[in-house]
Amino acid sequence: MSAPVLELLPAVDISEGYAVRPVGGTLSGGEQRLDPVEAALTWVKAGARWIHLVDLDLAFGRGTNTEVLAEVVAAVRAENAWMTGSAPVRVQVSGGVRNAESLERALSLNPDRVNVTSAALADSSWLEGVLAHYADSDLLALGLDARYNTERGWVTVARGTDWSGPDLAEALAWLESAGVRRYIVTDVSKDGSLAGPGAELLDEVLAQTACRVVASGGVASLADLVKLRSMVPYGLEGVVLGKALYVGNFSFEQALEVAGSR
């Protein structure tokens, strides 16, 4: 029996037309602006099988970068055309997809997967209809953002807003019945913090769902990837990697080795 493989999804965050990446090893280390296409192709050439492409401005309600995201997706597709003997690199689009307009915008990019934010839970009738429409497709994932509350336990939230939704167990039960096939799970207290990948939340989700799960946020070290890989037999599929890669805590090649991808 082969050892489990943890899928790695390096993140490319887009803001004001640029790929933005943190610099320095602290939370206040500043930001570097890069060409978005070059940023994405760096990971493709390093061996990534997925790119997690995020419109930060749409996520935080300060505009969109649709044209830039379209250029990145097209560049990855073009790079795939030159690659032989290996599976094509796929693109997961994320950031602010919470209603019909934003979903249509995301789908217009022709991505391989769209991550619908947990804020969509606020409009359950729309979300239920969308999940039913794509029930036989692997096109949609549900971004499950949560924060621990001392009185309620894990509670769903939407980053960039004051919205607080149902408790985790209630949300999972409803989403399962609505037809969710994959979750992108984030402990929002860990995201961007280099404080660990939120294993407690992941354990809770994996214990309550048979859907595929991708972890996001907080990874700081190769040891974190070892921990996440140990969860693969229990339903964890992959992890979105961001700050730890960009500030140099480890290389993508090292991450692939630990994840079992090479």
PLM regions and their residue ranges:
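C-terminal helical cap(s) of enzyme catalytic domains, especially alpha/beta-barrels
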Residues: 125-134, 229-232, 236-241, 245-262
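Alpha-helix-loop-beta-strand connector modules within alpha/beta enzyme cores
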Residues: 10, 62-92, 128-145, 196-222
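Catalytic cores of alpha/beta
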Residues: 90-114, 200-235, 250, 254-255
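Structural preference for beta-strand elements that scaffold enzyme active sites
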Residues: 7-11, 50, 88-92, 112-115, ...
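Conserved anion-binding
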Residues: 15-27, 107-191
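Conserved, mostly hydrophobic/aromatic
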Residues: 13, 43, 51, 106, ...
